């Protein structure tokens, strides 16, 4: 079994156009059983830290509804991770009401400090964490790429909220992962994921802390419908190493924890 805890839907011209159909076809082709998705249409800043133009901005409640509409197409295969616009908006009454109404489709909240230029330990996010704690939902956050997104800020939030599970997506993207790897073992409610993380880092995390701390995630279909096979230039995808070579480096139990059992436990996926 494979659970992908980090995939995307939504369009952000001219960079991304990722559809629910792409995710489902990819799951069929590469043997992924369940996928958690968030919508990139909640991005507030682009990769150059420029505000996303107003005509491309969507209100948080619309992004939430669109995400729920997507996972309703296949609720036995897709789950929602609503992406929060933490720079410009906080959960309002409509957002909270919708989340409660469709709680069965929602498996956590997604933060993207890089695309929001807001750190997870910013005190303005306390209402987000209060809602997550009330509903028993984990927090999944991009790490890496700018100061606000570095893993230490998610660590600070996790330390302040020991009853909430926090996942460091990317383990500090674009780095040697050392800082995130060191933080991973410091709190029982802090986890990492494999999205663009070298296999060697994942193996080291399991060697240090056991097999319960890392989750399988991919960013699918960020490089197109065959993200799990090759990148945009046709080079073999990192995830082929996770599907094949990594099996030889871990025990069966360790591999199962990484690829689906940890996700089942943390996100309460049945």
PLM region spans:
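Short amphipathic alpha-helical segments and helix-helix/interface helices
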Residues: 23-24, 67-71, 96-99, 125-129, ...
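Short active-site segment of divalent metal-dependent hydrolases/proteases
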Residues: 9-10, 145, 173, 222
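Active-site neighborhood of phospho(di)ester-bond hydrolases with catalytic His/Asp-centered motifs
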Residues: 2-5, 36-39, 81-83, 110, ...
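Proline-centered flexible-loop/turn and helix-kink motifs
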Residues: 75-76, 104, 162-163, 188, ...
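H/E-rich (His + Asp/Glu) clusters that bind or coordinate divalent metals
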Residues: 165, 172-270
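Residue-level detector of anion-binding/catalytic polar loops
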Residues: 33, 137-138, 191
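Mid-domain alpha/beta scaffold segments of enzyme catalytic cores
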Residues: 1-117, 123, 232, 240-241, ...
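Divalent metal-binding pocket/active-site signature
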Residues: 85-90, 97, 101-179
């Amino acid at each position: 079994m494979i659970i992908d805890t980090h995939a995307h839907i939504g369009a952000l011209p001219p960079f991304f156009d990722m559809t629910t159909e792409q995710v489902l076809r990819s799951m069929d082709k590469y043997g992924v059983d369940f996928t958690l998705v968030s919508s990139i249409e909640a991005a507030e800043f682009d990769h150059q830290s420029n505000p996303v133009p107003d005509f491309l901005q969507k209100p948080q409640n619309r992004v939430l509804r669109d995400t729920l509409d997507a996972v309703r197409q296949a609720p036995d295969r897709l789950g929602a991770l609503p992406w929060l616009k933490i720079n410009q908006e906080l959960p309002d009454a409509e957002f909270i009401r919708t989340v409660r109404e469709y709680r069965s489709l929602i498996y956590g909240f997604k933060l993207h400090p890089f695309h929001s230029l807001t750190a997870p330990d910013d005190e303005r996010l306390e209402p987000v964490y209060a809602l997550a704690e009330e509903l028993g939902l984990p927090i999944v956050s991009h790490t890496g790429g700018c100061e606000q997104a570095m893993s230490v800020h998610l660590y600070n939030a996790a330390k302040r909220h020991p009853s909430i599970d926090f996942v460091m997506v990317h383990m500090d993207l674009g780095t040697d992962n050392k800082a995130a790897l060191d933080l991973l073992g410091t709190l029982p409610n802090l986890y990492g994921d494999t999205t663009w993380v070298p296999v060697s880092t994942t193996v080291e995390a399991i060697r240090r802390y056991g097999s319960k701390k890392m989750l399988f995630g991919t960013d699918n279909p960020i490089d197109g419908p065959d993200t799990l096979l090759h990148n945009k230039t046709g080079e073999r995808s990192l995830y082929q190493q996770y599907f094949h070579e990594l099996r030889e480096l871990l025990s069966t139990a360790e591999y199962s924890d990484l690829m689906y059992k940890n996700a089942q436990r943390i996100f309460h996926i049945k």
